[in-house]
Amino acid sequence: MLVHLFRVGIRGGPVPRWSLQSLRFQTFSAARSSDDQFSSCLLRAVAQLRSQLRAHLPRSPPASHRSTSAWCWVGGTLVVPAVLWQHPRFCLIALCEAKGSPPAQPTRARELRFKWKLFWHFLHPHLLALGLAIVLALGAALVNVQIPLLLGQLVEIVAKYTREHVGSFVSESRRLSIQLLLLYGVQGLLTFGYLVLLSHMGERMAMDMRKALFSSLLRQDIAFFDAKKTGQLVSRLTTDVQEFKSSFKLVISQGLRSSTQVIGSLMTLSILSPRLTLMLAVVTPALMGVGTLMGSGLRKLSRQCQEQIARATGVADEALGSVRTVRAFAMEKREEERYQAELESCCCKAEELGRGIALFQGLSNIAFNCMVLGTLFIGGSLVAGQQLKGGDLMSFLVASQTVQRSMASLSVLFGQVVRGLSAGARVFEYMSLSPVIPLTGGYSIPSKDLRGSITFQNVSFSYPCRPGFNVLKNFTLKLPPGKIVALVGQSGGGKTTVASLLERFYDPTAGVVTLDGHDLRTLDPSWLRGQVIGFISQEPVLFATTIMENIRFGKLDASDEEVYTAARKANAHEFISSFPDGYSTVVGERGTTLSGGQKQRLAIARALIKRPTVLILDEATSALDAESERIVQEALDRASAGRTVLVIAHRLSTVRAAHSIIVMANGQVCEAGTHEELLQKGGLYAELIRRQALDASLPSAPPAEKPEDHRSCQ
């Protein structure tokens, strides 16, 4: 086709009165080959490419009725490949539009913005302390501005005494010396005052921000935690808040003071020598402009550095939190390498940021020193011409040094402020998030009317982190009040998802889940989880506190007697009493000092203490040995009496007594019935029973192959 296009161009292009459409048809027809589909797509892409080029190139005047012969085609043949080489997106857009599909847009990282309204919310309670700190800082700055004037007068006395040798130097300089000492003392007191106030205010603000951020994180949807790493969240609670607090304190303690000193010293300089001050006025705006340009790049680097720190923290948190798994697989070296890789990347980002800040400060110091040198040169010329006193030049030099130090401090502060604003934006990002599923609000069914009847009606669901994959598909299930319903099936079939929807960790994408005829979305989630549903998982999580507090976690206002009763029902009272500290025994992080069966019984007691109407057992005994399973199963049987129970089981021997057994596969109900009914059907459930029995009789046999889903899912 390209050869044909070049040939047509050499011939001179379209003749008069030929439409562009006819030329395109002629050219496209000549380009047809045996690969008709490829040629058609490519030709349409060329047509769209021409439109894209027209849209991006400047408009030209309407062409005459005669085309510009071969030169247009030759030029196009030479230019278009170069354009495509430099701008391949033209070709991508043309090809996608030729196929009828939109081009993929490049994903851009969303830039975080500092939320001043939220910042004001935390600053408002401390306005009085802030105002007083600002007054003290301004006072200290104004005192600093007065010091160069007194030093200049003192230098004049020294020069006069050196020239004339008249009078007493001590008597003439006593007054100025006392004034300077008083100013130094006042400056120290003012500095002490505003630093104490800023420290108090900064720590209080940081505490309030951490409380608000932690509260916001706890209120987020479970889907939020599916997509975020714990280490990154902890990093925002600690590192980012600390960075922001430090920056805020520096802005007041150094930024405000340095800015005031710069302004006051410049006013003093303009009074001492307008000519020298004019030189500074010309140079200073140029320096500020350069600093502003460099600041945007430093902010971006700072944000990337903090994000990398959060990733490194996430790796460390994951490894340390799962240290037993790491040790069991001898993967210490691999985790070290993972963490080292993240640290290397973090170090590179931090070094790049440090080089940027160092470049900024280095250029600032060079510029300021050149300003001092220029001041000495021009000021010396003025003194030689008797247009300026020596003492005034000394005052000017000291004041200009004050300006230099203050602006150097501002340059250092600039990098800190950049990091602080970026850290604050990251903190406020999560603080301003609103969960899709609120923690509170909605209808609470009176206890006298609560029966525990649960219905899943045509429910479909996909996890927010995997929106294109349906875990449940038109799933329908009814849990009668006071009955035990068991969900069995292969892993990944959607059993645990059913429990998550029942606890309203997520909302279904289609269909409805009801409790006693009420849509769960209309009920108070806090009431539903706190009083109606008790949840016991395969891996119970205990907190690093006493056994008493872990059981009371299910009902904070429970009395000691209620805790003892719940422990007895869970078959836990006996082993708890055998500990030297009894119920005051600290279980360690995640209950590491207890066995699996002991942790499971504490989890049962924690669920029973709130007297739930509905009980969810998510493979509660699958990770236990035979003896522990027997003890725990006794407790579960006792806990299930009179309650609506949803059992998720892998060991089918534990669900034989269920009133109804639901066999799930691929997010759908394949079979339903009692144990005997399902065995008589000879379907998927019977196959699972047969394979588990075979595995039990052959303990050394390899894992059985998974049965095919289509056996009973017609």
UniProtKB/Swiss-Prot annotation:
GO terms for molecular function: ABC-type transporter activity; ATP binding; ATP hydrolysis activity; ATPase-coupled transmembrane transporter activity. Channel activity inhibited by ATP via ABCB8/MITOSUR subunit. GO terms for biological process: cell volume homeostasis; mitochondrial potassium ion transmembrane transport; potassium ion transmembrane transport; transmembrane transport. CDD domains: ABC_6TM_ABCB8_like, ABC_MTABC3_MDL1_MDL2. It is a multi-pass membrane protein. Residues 132-419 form the ABC transmembrane type-1 domain. Strong expression is found in the heart, brain and testis. In the testis, expressed both in the somatic Sertoli cells and peritubular cells and in the germline (spermatogonia and pachytene spermatocytes). Also expressed in the lung, liver, intestine and kidney. It is found in: Mitochondrion inner membrane. ATP-binding subunit of the mitochondrial ATP-gated potassium channel (mitoK(ATP)). v. An increase in ATP intracellular levels closes the channel, inhibiting K(+) transport, whereas a decrease in ATP levels enhances K(+) uptake in the mitochondrial matrix. Plays a role in mitochondrial iron transport. Required for maintenance of normal cardiac function, possibly by influencing mitochondrial iron export and regulating the maturation of cytosolic iron sulfur cluster-containing enzymes. This is Mitochondrial potassium channel ATP-binding subunit. The gene is Abcb8.
